[in-house]
Amino acid sequence: MPTRNLLLGSILLSLAVKGDPGPHRGARCGVSPLGSATELNYLSRIVGGRESKKGQHPWTVSLKRNGKHFCGGTLVSHCHVLTAAHCLLDRNVKLYMRVYIGEYDQILKEETEQMFRVIEIFKHPNFNQSQPMNYDVAVLLLDGSVTFDENIQPACLPNPDDVFEPGDLCVTLGWGHLTENGILPVVLQEVYLPIVDLSSCLHVMSALKGTVVSSYIVCAGFPEGGKDACQGDSGGPLLCQRRHGSWVLHGLTSWGMGCGRSWKNNVFLPHNRKGSPGIFTDIQKLLGWVSSQLNTAVPNKNQESCSMQDGVLSGKSGELIFLKNPMSVTRTMSGAPGFSLSLKTCTSCLNFTHLDIESDFACNLDYLAIYTDSHRLIGKFCGDIPPRSLLISFSSIKLNFFSDFHENRTGFVLYYSAVEPNTYPDSGCGSFAVLFEEGEIQSMNYPENYLSNSRCHWIIHGPSGSYIKLQFEDFALEPSDDCRSDYLAVYQDLAAEDKIETFCGFSLPAPVYSTTAVMHIKFSTDERDNDKGFRATFTFVSPNSLVEDSRQGNMPSTNKKETTAQDSICGVSQVPPIFIYNSIAKVEEAVPHSWPWHTSLQYAGEHVCDGAIIAENWILTTASCVLNRKFNDVWLVDPGIHDLLRPGHNQKGLVKQIIPHPSFSSQTNDFDIALVELDESLQFNSDIFPICLPGKTSELAPASLCVVSGWSLRGKEAEKSTKLQQREVPILTDDACSAHYIQNPGGITDRMLCAGIGTGQDNDSCSEQSGSPLVCLLEKKGIYTIFGIASWGVNCKENSKPGIYTKVSPFIDWIRQIMSDTGQIHSNLGDPKPHPMGNIEPEETAGRDIIQGGFPTNDASSNQNLYIASSCEDVVLLQSPGEIKMETKSQMYPNGFSCQWRIIAPKFQIIKLVMKQVHMSAENGKCCNSLIIYEGISKNKTLKVRFPTDEMVPGTVWSEGSSVTIESPPHPVDPEFGFCLVYSFHSRTQSQDHVVPDSDSSEP
C-alpha cells in the first residue's frame, strides 16, 4: 500500500510585538525587590492592619488632593495606573489630582517618590454612580513615563488562566482608616484576607438593603470581622501571589459595610451593625476592557496590524482558526489572542524555528500556551529556547499568546503539520518528542499541575561521540518511598533498560549525565496527588569535559538524605515545609519529614491519634486520646512516619507511662492534655526532632497563621489520607470562638483556643484529629513552636466550624514538673482515686471490648484463674491464661456477622494457642465457615493458620511475636458453628514448633 502524504497544511505564524522597549527597561511586574512577603508574614500575621515594609509593595500608588491622600491605586505600566471609578466622581478631579508613586510615608518627602499629573481618565462605560460597586474601575494615563527602580515596579495584570480560589490569602494595601471612623496612618498598611466564595458573598449582600451587586466583584475577609479595608483604601490593590512568586492585581478596593464588622449573622443584626466582606472589582473579568485602554491610551502609539498574506500575525487580541481546509481563515476578537489548528483524524506536530518571548521562571508574564480543543493545557512556553519537535496526539489544538505591557520581544515562528497517528508511539499524556538538538523539556501542563495516569516519553539523540547533560530548573513531583507513585526516570539507551536514576519529591535533582549519545526520559504519574512537575534543559557535552569536571570535583553527587541533627535544640526542620497553596481552605500533603516532631500514636497496632515530640522521651498529646485506652503495653509510638501504610522509621517506641492531666473533663473537654513517656530515648535526626514549647505567658495575636498537621485533616466525611497532611489555619479571637460554640458545656475556657474558618453550620463535635500539633513560626527566632493540640471539632466536617485546640502555654509548669520527675511512675491513667473533677465514667469504645486486667509478673502458664472471653465483635485480650469460646447454638447472631479477638502479650513474650474444638455443619464447612489466626494485630498482619483442619484439632499454635489476631469472617448463620480455644503467654525459650497437633491438650 503506498504511503499517503498526510501533510494537510503548513503555515508560518510569526507574532511580532512592535514598540520601543525603552520605557519598560528595568520593569519586572509583580516582583518585590524585598522578595516574597509570604515566608514569615503568612506564618506570623496574615492580617492585623500592620505596617508594610518600605519597598515591599513597589506598585502601590497614592492619589492626593491638595497634598492629602484620598484614594489608592496600582501601577500597571510605565504610564498607567488602575484605581476605582468611584474615586473620580468630581468632574474637576483631573485638574487637582496628583499621582504619587514610590510613596511610603505620607508626611515625609522621600527620595523614592515620583509625582505625575493625569492627562486622561478612562472610566468603565458600565460604571453607574448610583450603583458604585459595579464595574468600579478606571484607568489613569499619566503625563510622563515612570522610571522603574528597586522602589517602583508595576504589578502584574491577571492572565486569563490565573485561578485564585476561596480561602486563598491575598493582601490589600492602603493608607485608609485603621478603624471605622478612626485615625489615618502615616505609613502604608497591609492586610491579608482570604478570598470568599462569590455565591456566599452575594448571599450576605442580599441581607443589606439597597445594595445591588454584579458578578464582576471579588469578595475577601473573615466572617468574624476584625480585619478589612476601610475608608481611604478605595482604589487600592487586592494582590494575590502566584505559586511561583509574582504578585497579581486580582481586585481593586471598592466597597464594604463598615470596617471590619462581622457578617456571619447579618440576618439577626440591626442595620447599623450589619457588616460585609470587603468588595473588590474583579480585574480578571474586566481584563478585556482594561487591556483595550492600555493599548489605545498611549499617544502616537503605532497600531499593530494583522496580515495573513505575509504570514505575520500581530496584535494583542485575536484568534486565527484553521477549519477542515487549513487555508480557510477567519479572525475573531477575544480576551486573549489565540490561534486554532484543526487537523481532522490526525496528530498535530509543532516545530518551533524561533522563540523570543519575555522570559519568566513560570511563564506568567508573556507566554504561548497550547491547549487541546477542550481547553486542557498542554504546555506554556516563553524565553528564547524553542521547544523541539512537539508531537501532540490531538487532532485539534489551540494556541493562545498572552503578553503584558512591559517587555517587548520579537515573538515566535512555528510550523505545524499533520502526521499519521501511529508515526510515533502514543505517550498517553498527549505529547511525545524525539529531539536532535539542545533544548528544553517540561512536564505536560507545566507550571500547573500535571495530569493523572500519564505516561510521557522524550528521546534525545546527541551527536556521535557526545554525552548528554540534563539540568533541572524546577522540580516538584509527588513524593513517595522508592518513587513508586509519580516519578521521572532517566535512561541512557533507546530500550530504556540502562537506567541512570529515578527522581520524585520536591528536591531539585543534581544534573544527570548519560555516558552515551542517547537519553531516554520517562515521566509516569498515578491517579492522585499531582504537582506542578518539572522543567529541564539538555545539552550535549564531550566526554573530555566530564573527565575534567571529575578531576576538579565538580561532578554532581547523588542526593543523599542527611541524618545529622540540627544545631538548634527544637523547632527546626531540615526539610523545609512547602505550601503549594497560599490558602486557609485547602488541605495538602506535607513534604515527607518536614514536620519531624509529628508522631503517630498507635493502640493495638492501629493509628488512633497524633502527638508531638517535645523531648527525647516525651510525647505531647490529648487526654481524650489516651483516657480510655489504659494499657501501656498496647501502645506504640511511631515517629518519623509519613505514610501509615508503609513502614516508617526504625525508632518505634514502647510506652513507659501515660499521664493525662488530672483535671481533664470528658464532659467539657477542658484540660485536654496528656504526656506519654517512652521506654527508650529517641535518637534525633532529620526525620525525628522535637518541637519547641511556648513560654507561660506566650499569646498568639488574632489572625496569626499557624499550621496543623495530621492524617485526618480532610474531614470526617472525606476519605482519610494515609499520608501526612498539612493545613494553614488562622487564630480566632476568643469572642469569635465562643460564638461558634455557644452550646458547648462549660463554654470555651482560657485553656482552649480556636483556629480555622467556618461557615457556621452545625457540627457534631468530634476528635478525628485528636492530638495533632498546632505549630506557629516565630518570626524573630525563625523556629516553630507548639501553641495548641487538636482537641475536638477539628475538621469534623469540611470547614463547618473552627477547630478547638488545647492551649499549651497554661500547662508549661505542669509539663515541666512531670518531665522533671523522670523516675516517678505517675498514676493519673486508670487511677482508682476519685478524679479531681468528680468521678468520670469511661466512655464506651465503639465496636470494641477491652478486657481489663494486669499482666502477670511470672510465666503466664502458672496456675491462675482462667479468664473466659465471651464477647465477639472486636475484643482486645491482655490477661493470661484465657479462653475464647463461641457457640452459635446459645447466641442469636445476624446473618453476615463477624468476630475478631486480638491477643496482646507483654513485650518480649509470645503466645501459645491451643485449639480445643471446632465444629460446624458439614455443608457450611465446605464453603463458608472458618476460623483464621493471623500473626500481628495491625493492617499488615500475616496469615498463620486457618481452621478447621482435621489433623490440627486439637492442636497448638505458637506466635512469633507478642500479638495475634483471631477472626471468624462474615458468613451465614450456622446453628452448629462453634469453637473453644485457650491461650497463655510464655517466654520465647518455651516455644515449640509453630503448629503442633496435640495428643494431650489438657494444659494450655
From Swiss-Prot:
What sequence ranges are listed for the domain Peptidase S1? 46-295, 580-820
Q: Glycans attached where?
A: 128, 351, 408, 763, 940
Any GO MF annotation of the entry = serine-type endopeptidase activity
This protein's UniProt keywords = Calcium, Disulfide bond, Glycoprotein, Hydrolase, Metal-binding, Protease, Repeat, Secreted, Serine protease, Signal, Zymogen
* Residue ranges, compositional bias (Polar residues): 547-558
* Signal sequence bounds: 1-19
For this protein, the record's PANTHER family field holds:
ACROSIN-RELATED, OVOCHYMASE 1
Q: What is this protein called?
A: Ovochymase-2
Organism phylogeny: Eukaryota, Metazoa, Chordata, Craniata, Vertebrata
